[in-house]
């Protein structure tokens, strides 16, 4: 299972191609499947990664009553889209399909709340959950991450953080601070410079943070 943003088509391409190399089909939500159609129309996604081309399939989440009743629980666009997929010979799958053939699919979800879908899929103990997004940068994101981790423990899954953005991760920043042991720190290109107060404590170093430096403060 991979958690990644619904609009990050570059990352999706990487995920889907990795799945293909391992003889797996990528399963995405109806909403993401519809987004993939848009990306293809804009020339940003190859046709081979559209639902129906054999490498990607749409799955139908449980909604409302908890059963899969398209007429009762699903929006009109969802019903229409499912019908379009069926007309093209690309019938969507359901959680029971993913559960029965777990070695055949890579399931992609797009938000922390989507982890609840896994309760119906019932992943095999030890299954891998990949956080393919940046690490939490604020309290709300920290809470979301912890909530997902709690569910993963209940489901018997193990999590892995896989993200390449050119930015150092939290653990990497702590290690850099520990190794460099600076006397002064000037956060640059940071939306949350105050977070460095926490990082310094975790690194166990004594350091003065200068958020809006004056020339006199830059003298060592």
Predicted regions mapped to residue ranges:
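Acidic/His-rich, metal-assisted hydrolase cores and their charged scaffolds
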Residues: 1-220
